[in-house]
Amino acid sequence: MKKQEKNTALELEAFVKEKGVQFGKFVSGWLTPKRLFWFLLVVYLLSLVPLLWIGFYNYPSADDYSIGSDCRQAFVNTHSLLVTVWTGIVRAADDWLNWMGYFTSNFLMALPPNTFGERAYVWTSVIMIGALSLSTAYLLKVIFCRVFHADKYLAGSVILLMLFITVQRMQGRVEAFYWYSGAANYILVHSFCMWFYGLLISAIYDTGKKRTGKLVGASVLGFLVGGGNQMTALNGAVVLLAVILCVSLQKKWRTYRAFWWPIGLYYLGFLLNVAAPGNWVRAADATGMNPVKAIFVSFYYAFDYCINEWSGWPVLFLVLILIPLFYNMAGKTDFSFPCPLGVIAFGFCLVAAMMTPPLFAVGSMEAQRLQALTYTVYILVVTLSTGYTAGWFRKKLDQKNQNQQFSGNTARYILFCLLFFTFASALAVIPTPHYFTFSSAITDLANGSARAYGEARKERIAIYESGERDVVVKELPAQPELLYFSDIQEDPEFWENKGMCKFYGFDSVRLQKELK
C-alpha cells in the first residue's frame, strides 16, 4: 500500500514537472523581448492618456501670474516673440541680481505658456511628461545600447518599466506635471540634465561631425543645467567631479580633451548660479541650516523618504522584474561590473545630495516639487544600481551565453511579476483611487471635479478680460488632486492677488467666498 502511494506521488511529481516544462516552453516562445517591449510601450502610452486628458482642464496659478507678468505684458503690447523672449531674459537677469541665482530656471519661469494665452497652459503637462520621458529614455538607451551593447528591446523594456513607476507613482504630481512654474524649475531642468549626460556619453562613441555636434549641444545644455535649480546643478557637479577623477586616474585626458568644453561650461554656469548676488538677498529672509548640518541631515532625509515613504511594493516590483532583464542584457558586454557596493553607495550619496541645497536654503524638504525631483532621481538610481548589481552577479557566474531570448524559467517569472503587479494595483486603487497618477486623473475626470474646476476657471478668465478695474471672483467649486495648486485670497493685498493684477493689468482682485 505504501509502495503504491509512493509510486502515485512520484507519478504526480513527474506529471507536474512535465507540464511545468511545457508551460515554460510555451511562455518563453510567446514572451519574447520584442513582444514584451511592445506590450510595455502600449501600456505606458495608454497610462499617459488620462494624464494628458485631464490637462485640458489645467489653468495657471501663483507664480505663473506673478513671475510671468512681465512677459505677458510684453506680448500683449507688442505681439512680438523676440520682444517677449528678451523680456524673459531681462527678468531672469534681474532675479539673478535681486532674488535667486538659477538663471535658467528664472528664464523658464518668466515665460509660462499662459504668456501667449490662458489656453496655451494645457501644454504644460505635455511638455513636462514628454520631456521627462524622452530625456530619460535617451540617456538610458545610450548607456544600455551604446556602452553595454544590450539588446534594444530589453533596454526598451527596462526604460518603460522605470518610466511607469516614475510617472505613475510620482510624488507631488501637481507640482511635477501641472503647475508650470514648479515643474519648469525642477522636472524640465532635470530633463535637460538627462539630455546633457546622454549627449556626453554618446559623443565618446562618435567621431567627426557627429561628435562635434553632440559636444556643442552638450556645451549649451551644460551651461543651462549648471544655471538651473540648485538641486540638479549640484548633483551634476558631483557626477562630473567623479568622472574627472576617474579619467584623471586612468590618465586619459588627452583622449577626452574635447570634453573639457561642455564640462567647463557646466561648471561656469554652476559658479554663476551659486555666486549670484540674489542668493544673499533671499537668504536674508530664509532660515536654513549651516552647510555641515545640511549635509548630515540630507543623509537622514534620504533614508527617511526613500525607505519609509517611497519604497513601497511598486518599487519592489520594479527591482524584482528588472533583475532578469538586466541579467540577460549583461551577456553581451565584457565589462566586469566591479565594486557594486561602492556604486550603490555613490548612488545613495547622489540622492542625499539632491536634498542638501533646500536644507541649506530653507531648512526643509516639505515643498512637493522638491520631493518630486528627488523621487525621480531615486528611481533612476534604483534602476541603474539594480542593473549594475545584476551585471556583477552574472560576471561572477562567468556565463558566456549571449542568447537574448528568455528561458522558460525567466519567462514564467516575468509573467508572474506582471500578473502580480496588475492584481496588486487593482487592490491598491479600489480603496485609494489616487494611488497612481493615472487612477487619480481618471477619478477626477469621472466624478466631474476636473470639469467643474475647468469651467470655473474659464468663467474667471472672462471676468479678468472684461475690462473691470476691481475684480471679484467666486470660490472654486472643486480642487482636483492633479490640477489645483493654490488660489487667490479674500485679501486683495495677498501676493498672489497682486501678481494677477500685474499679469492682467487691473487694479485689484479678490476672492468672494460663499456663505455656508
What annotation goes with each model-predicted range?
Residues 1-30:
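Short, Lys/Arg-rich, polar N-terminal cytosolic tail immediately upstream
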Residues 15, 24-95, 99, 113-156, ...:
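Intrinsically disordered, polar/acidic, low-complexity terminal segments
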Residues 52-122, 180, 226-370:
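Transmembrane catalytic cores of multi-pass membrane glycosyltransferases
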Residues 63, 152-201, 229, 353-387:
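Membrane-interface micro-motifs in multi-pass membrane enzymes
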Residues 118-134, 183-191, 226-227, 233:
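Individual alpha-helical transmembrane segments in multi-pass integral membrane proteins
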Residues 132-144, 192-204, 238-246, 319-326, ...:
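Transmembrane alpha-helical segments
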Residues 202-224:
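Short hydrophobic alpha-helices at membrane interfaces in multi-pass membrane enzymes
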Residues 210-214, 250-264, 335-342, 400-421:
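Membrane-interfacial entry segments at the cytosolic side of transmembrane helices
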